[in-house]
Amino acid sequence: MLLMNLQLFATKKGVGSSKNGRDSEAKRLGVKCADGQFVLAGSILVRQRGTKIHPGQNVGRGGDDTLFSKVDGVVRYERVGKNKKRASVYPIDVEEVIAAE
């Protein structure tokens, strides 16, 4: 009786799956209105996570910590103390803005 020791090899290489390859969408956070810019009531000033910038005069804070203007006016970003920032909106007449331009 003839004994054969036969070794079979794979004809196709097994391909492993990568555990990377995913990423979340960017949230587009940051300052939306510059210092000295004229804004209308309801305009978003800053999109942020947490209170990196605190609400000041005539500025409201949304549920996701977004800062928005409560009145028409000019945006001002101010330092409060050593490492705290505050956004305020100071109301001015629209006629003054048009005359200045």
Swiss-Prot record:
Post-translational events: The N-terminus is cleaved by ribosomal processing cysteine protease Prp.
One term of GO molecular function: structural constituent of ribosome
Domain of life (superkingdom): Bacteria
Membrane-crossing segments per the record: none
Propeptide residues, chain positions: 1-9
Keyword annotations: Ribonucleoprotein, Ribosomal protein
BP terms from Gene Ontology: translation
InterPro entries: Ribosomal_bL27, Ribosomal_bL27_CS
Keyword presence, Ribonucleoprotein: yes
Gene Ontology CC: cytosolic large ribosomal subunit
Family to which the UniProt record says this protein belongs: Belongs to the bacterial ribosomal protein bL27 family.
Cross-referenced HAMAP family: Ribosomal_bL27 (MF_00539)
Protein name from the UniProt record: Large ribosomal subunit protein bL27
Species of provenance: Clostridium tetani (strain Massachusetts / E88)
Taxonomic lineage of the native organism: Bacteria, Bacillati, Bacillota, Clostridia, Eubacteriales
